[in-house]
Design a protein with these regions (language model features):
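A short, amphipathic edge element
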Residues: 2-18
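A short coil-to-beta-strand element that immediately follows conserved catalytic motifs
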Residues: 13, 116-124
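Acidic, metal-coordinating catalytic segment for phosphate/diphosphate chemistry
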Residues: 20-65, 79
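Active-site-adjacent beta-strand/loop module that shapes the phosphate/pyrophosphate-binding cleft
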Residues: 32-36, 130-151
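Conserved Nudix-box catalytic region and its N-terminal flanking loop in Nudix hydrolases
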Residues: 47-50, 59, 67-107, 157-159, ...
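Beta-rich strand-turn-strand
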Residues: 98-103, 112, 116-118
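NUDIX/MutT-family hydrolases
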Residues: 155-181
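Acidic two-metal-ion nuclease catalytic site recognized across multiple nuclease folds
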Residues: 199-229
Length: 229
């Protein structure tokens, strides 16, 4: 979780930072001013910030079957936003103290799908899903799995999770995207990235690459080889 007072920046002066409330989520209150584009400093402002912290999402892809493993679970805020409470998503979760994003990608994949990641996940992107109200950052990965092992219900019982595994071909995923049936932000980013890099991933992870030993060469020459996390 983020500290109450953020890192210093020459364009922002934090006058005061106080904790508002904290349950599962935490809200802090900031008094600050900032440098205006026209020059000089703004008037003092007061801002409520949701301190969501760091999260991870991972697109689980089987290159041999050209399938992706998604999860479906109930999201009350989606219902409040006028959307379906049953959301199709990539596996995701928050980073706990002492964890790295990569560790969370492995843990959440196991907890939410029962699958083990094969090899090392590829970093996709770090992005800010709602920086007008929250400090949350999301680190996205793409990881290889065996989709034939994906089935059933999963989740951590102590956390009240009720998660159903859903396997889709990439053609089916593309149709869902075109129909606007996937509404979750980090899932949209991850799936559009996967569609863009699908052919390369099949070369990198597919049976031909493994047989010929070309996986490492493809990774070093890849436009996606440099971690952004």
């Amino acid at each position: 979780m983020s500290e109450t007072r953020p890192s210093a920046h020459p364009d922002v002066e934090i006058i005061e930072a106080t904790k508002g409330f904290e349950r599962f989520l935490r809200m802090d209150v900031f008094r600050f001013r900032y440098r205006r584009f026209s020059g000089g400093w703004s008037a003092e402002r007061t801002y409520d910030v949701l301190r969501r912290g760091q999260a991870v999402g991972v697109a689980l892809y089987d290159p041999d079957r050209d399938e992706i493993v998604l999860i479906e679970q109930l999201r009350l805020p989606a219902l409040l936003a006028g959307a379906s409470p049953r959301q199709l998503e990539v596996a995701a979760g928050l980073v706990d103290v002492g964890e790295t994003p990569l560790m969370v990608a492995v843990r959440e994949t196991r907890e939410e799908t029962g699958l083990a990641i094969k090899g090392e996940p590829i970093p996709i992107q770090r992005y800010l899903p709602s920086c007008g109200a929250s400090d949350e950052s999301v680190d996205l990965f793409c990881a290889r799995v065996d989709a034939t092992e994906a089935a059933g219900l999963h989740g951590v019982p102590e956390e009240g999770e009720d998660i159903r595994v859903v396997v889709k071909t990439l053609a089916e995923v593309e149709a869902l995207l075109d129909a606007g049936a996937i509404e979750n932000g980090h899932t949209l980013v991850a799936l559009y990235w996967l569609l863009r890099h699908r052919d390369h991933l099949r070369q990198l992870w597919g049976p031909t690459a493994a047989k010929n030993g070309h996986g490492a060469d493809l990774l070093s020459a890849s436009p996606i080889e440099k971690p952004r996390i």
